[in-house]
């Protein structure tokens, strides 16, 4: 006889079995196999929290297409300002890392446990101090490969602006004179020109000296009033670092980790990734501590270099104003090709970004982490950071017009108050007016306190220099 109870049991069993199969199917397929992912795992990507000291990471944009071709538009002039690629620590940071390494090595710990358990078989990641300051050459995040690969990417993008069949023409590439910057420029140029590199590229190294004045990519060196130490690490509370030290001393006893060691561990993670492509130190810090150390870097960048520094905008305007002059010249470019590729340091890039008004945010607080801000140094000036400024010639309503498009770290970056053009670009005339208005008080000689008898150049002219 039919039993309602038995039927219910069967129904429940079938439902359970169906649920198990569904879970197994989801496990096999994985959430990332869905047509459109529903997770935001990239927020946990450690490369987004290294304060500009780790490998390149693209900017989190707005989903705007960055293709070289926009309907009814062509790129007819382009500027690149790029930071050198991934590098070894500086000499000073290297000493700081060595000190932590020696401290951990000397600790009276027979068998390490917890997050620092790997240290039992760990060797310092820089085999020779001569590597300090240099570009990295191998691993997943090789700085030289970053430069070469980006050169190949831009060649595809700007191929229509290069005619390699014309004899005697050269592509000029400018770089700060520090070795890693020049190396970046050379490897980029090799990627861009391939086998024609030696014949068709001239890499111009601009001295990073006061005597170079404003005719350089490091104008800050010639600004006597510039103070790059407005913010100091001790200006922000270290309660998070103290909690993290307590956590590590509980989980990995015997190493006597202090609050001062926490930012150094973060440095270890970033630079070892640059060199080896992996780092066990990246798994040592808690998420809270990692966000804390990243914010310390943000504060340093903001107050010592960017918007929070009274001279950041003035110094950055030297380069921004020179590119403005080239963008306005729609008759004929002064060089063989309408391409202006420049290479420098993170500091110099951020000062240019400031003069362009890319990150006009309220001052970062010095008592708590500001999460709701667009000023994230990791996304703004990672190793290999790059700013593209493209002039577009577009046909709009039957008339040819010029526009300017800004691309920061591979993401189209619409200007907050000027994005009415194709692809959210800015009309050229409006771009110029906006830049001049933002920098009406950016008088370098006056603001920087340049002596009246200064013998160094007071304008950037290398884009036009040495023209036959």
UniProtKB/Swiss-Prot annotation:
Q: Which Pfam families match?
A: His_Phos_2
What PROSITE patterns does its record include?
Answer: HIS_ACID_PHOSPHAT_1, HIS_ACID_PHOSPHAT_2
Which class of enzymes does this protein belong to? Answer: hydrolase
Record keyword Electron transport present: no
Catalytic center residues: 84 (nucleophile), 346 (proton donor)
Molecular-function GO terms, alphabetical: acid phosphatase activity
The region annotated as signal peptide is 1-22
What's its EC?
3.1.3.2
The cellular component terms of Gene Ontology attached to this UniProt record, alphabetical and capped at eight, are: fungal-type cell wall
What reaction gets catalysed by this protein? Answer: a phosphate monoester + H2O = an alcohol + phosphate
- Which superkingdom is the protein from? Eukaryota
Q: What induces it?
A: By phosphate starvation.
Fetch the CDD domains from UniProt. HP_HAP_like (cd07061)
Assigned keywords, A-Z: Glycoprotein, Hydrolase, Signal, Stress response
Where on this protein are sugars attached? 163, 196, 256, 321, 360, 453
Similarity comment: family membership? Belongs to the histidine acid phosphatase family.
Put simply, this protein is called Acid phosphatase PHO1
**Which gene is transcribed and translated to give this protein?**
PHO1
């Amino acid at each position: 006889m039919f039993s309602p109870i038995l039927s219910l049991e069967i129904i429940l069993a079938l439902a359970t079995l169906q649920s198990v199969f569904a879970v197994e199917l989801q496990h096999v397929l994985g959430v990332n196999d869905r047509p459109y992912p529903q997770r935001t795992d990239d927020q946990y990507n450690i490369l987004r929290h290294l304060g500009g000291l780790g490998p390149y990471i693209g900017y989190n944009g707005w989903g705007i297409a960055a293709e070289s071709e926009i309907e009814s538009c062509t790129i007819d002039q382009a500027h690149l300002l790029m930071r050198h690629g991934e590098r070894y620590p500086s000499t000073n940071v290297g000493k700081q890392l060595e000190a932590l390494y020696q401290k951990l090595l000397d600790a009276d710990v027979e068998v390490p446990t917890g997050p620092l358990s790997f240290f039992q078989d760990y060797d310092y990641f820089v085999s020779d101090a001569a590597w300090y300051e240099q570009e990295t050459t191998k691993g997943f995040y090789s700085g030289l490969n970053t430069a070469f690969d980006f050169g190949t990417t831009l060649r595809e993008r700007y191929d229509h602006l290069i005619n390699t069949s014309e004899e005697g023409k050269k592509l000029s590439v400018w770089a700060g004179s520090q070795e890693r910057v020049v190396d970046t420029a050379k490897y980029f140029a090799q990627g861009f020109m391939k086998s024609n590199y030696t014949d068709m590229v001239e890499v111009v190294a601009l001295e990073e000296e006061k005597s170079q004045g404003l005719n350089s990519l490091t104008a800050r060196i010639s600004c006597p009033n510039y103070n790059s130490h407005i913010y100091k690490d001790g200006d922000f509370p270290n309660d998070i670092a103290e909690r993290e030290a307590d956590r590590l001393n509980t989980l990995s006893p015997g190493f006597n980790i202090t609050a001062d060691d926490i930012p150094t561990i973060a440095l270890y993670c970033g630079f070892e990734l640059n060199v080896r492509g992996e780092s066990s130190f990246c798994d040592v810090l808690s998420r809270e501590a990692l966000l804390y150390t990243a914010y310390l870097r943000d504060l340093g960048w903001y107050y010592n270099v960017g918007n929070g520094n009274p001279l950041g905008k003035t110094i950055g305007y030297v380069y921004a104003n020179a590119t403005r002059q080239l963008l306005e010249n729609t008759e004929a470019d002064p060089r063989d090709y309408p391409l202006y590729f420049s290479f420098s340091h993170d500091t110099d890039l951020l000062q240019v970004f400031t003069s362009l008004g890319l990150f006009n945010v309220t001052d970062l607080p010095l008592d708590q982490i500001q999460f709701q801000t667009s000023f994230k140094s990791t996304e703004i000036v990672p190793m290999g950071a790059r700013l593209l400024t493209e002039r577009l010639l577009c046909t709009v309503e039957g008339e040819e017009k010029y526009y300017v498009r800004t691309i920061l770290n591979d993401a189209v970056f619409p200007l907050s108050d000027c994005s009415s053009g194709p692809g959210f670009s800015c009309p050229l005339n409006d771009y110029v007016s906006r830049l001049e208005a933002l920098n009406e008080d950016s008088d370098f000689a006056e603001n920087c306190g340049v002596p009246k008898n200064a013998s160094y150049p007071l304008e950037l002219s290398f884009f036009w220099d040495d023209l036959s």
